[in-house]
């Protein structure tokens, strides 16, 4: 049995190294190193790392208990680490193209049910009002057209389960993890919506200009009514099953805005809707 130790600073540093190794943030992507760092972080007392190891090894009830603050009496981190089937986690699912103009595709099982529940659990206590970007004012602000809440995940707040989901996004799109912005978990209560909008702008001189080549949306639950993602220009709507995904290119092949990608999150009429949103930019060199 491993002897657990407590060193918060070292535990946080090891967890940070795990995420860096998984996300190509500096050194080349190295999943073995990522899991090694995660195990060390768990051994040093990181509850988040402990919960991640439990979940990745299939011990999901324990993972949620740890995430909620439960203590683990022994130290099974090495055993959990050795039982993780990384190849299964990273195996990319098939993609189905549903539109060539604009370019839209769907994925049936991008995230497991358990990963969806994990992401919701991590986001729920950290939700805040969503904002829109005002191109004229060059800043983010609250807007009448967007009434939902959101939880951003900058790198210090990410975990290896989220990193694996993003790696699967990279696999099915052919895009780089390094080109991805920080992901956001979106939450819609009854009546909340996001009015028709574009995810990128035509004006490269805008103060907040970000060339978002592709938008990737993952349904984290499906036990609600309404809330479809709607494309009013082409007359299409999508509501994915739990773990399913939709992605579309915001730009034409020449890089200009594809105005057919105007889309909206329709109001939820019953229950609550959870979704992961991932914007991806152009390839990053180096």
Q: Can you say where each PLM-predicted feature lies in the sequence?
A:
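Structural signature of tandem alpha-helical TPR/SEL1-like repeats
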Residues: 28-36
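Short coil/turn and helix-start
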Residues: 25-29, 43
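Fe(II)/2-oxoglutarate oxygenase catalytic core
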Residues: 1-5, 19, 36-246, 251-286
């Amino acid at each position: 049995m491993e002897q657990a130790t407590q060193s918060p600073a070292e535990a946080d540093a090891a967890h940070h190294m795990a995420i860096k190794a998984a996300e190509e943030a500096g050194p080349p992507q190295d999943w073995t190193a990522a899991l090694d760092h995660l195990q060390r972080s768990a051994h040093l007392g990181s509850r988040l790392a402990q919960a991640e190891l439990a979940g990745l090894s299939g011990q999901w009830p324990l993972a949620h208990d740890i995430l909620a603050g439960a203590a683990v009496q022994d130290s099974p981190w090495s055993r959990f680490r050795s039982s993780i089937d990384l190849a299964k986690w990273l195996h990319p699912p098939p993609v189905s193209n549903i539109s060539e103009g604009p370019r839209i595709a769907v994925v049936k099982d991008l995230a497991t049910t358990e990963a969806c529940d994990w992401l919701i659990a991590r986001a729920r206590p950290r939700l805040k009002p969503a904002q829109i970007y005002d191109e004229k004012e060059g800043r983010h602000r609250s807007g009448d057209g967007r009434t939902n809440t959101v939880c951003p995940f900058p790198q210090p707040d990410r975990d290896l389960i989220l990193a694996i989901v993003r790696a699967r996004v990279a696999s099915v799109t052919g895009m780089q993890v390094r080109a991805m912005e920080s992901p956001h978990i979106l939450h819609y209560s009854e009546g909340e919506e996001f009015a028709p909008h574009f995810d990128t702008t035509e004006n490269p001189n805008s103060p907040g200009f970000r060339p978002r080549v592709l938008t990737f949306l993952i349904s984290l639950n499906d036990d609600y009514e309404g809330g479809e993602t709607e494309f009013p220009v082409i007359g299409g709507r999508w509501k994915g099953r739990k773990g399913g995904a939709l992605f579309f290119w915001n730009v034409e092949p020449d890089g200009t805005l594809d105005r057919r990608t105007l889309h909206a999150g329709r109001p939820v009429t019953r229950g609550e809707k959870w979704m992961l949103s991932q914007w991806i930019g152009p390839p990053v060199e180096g």
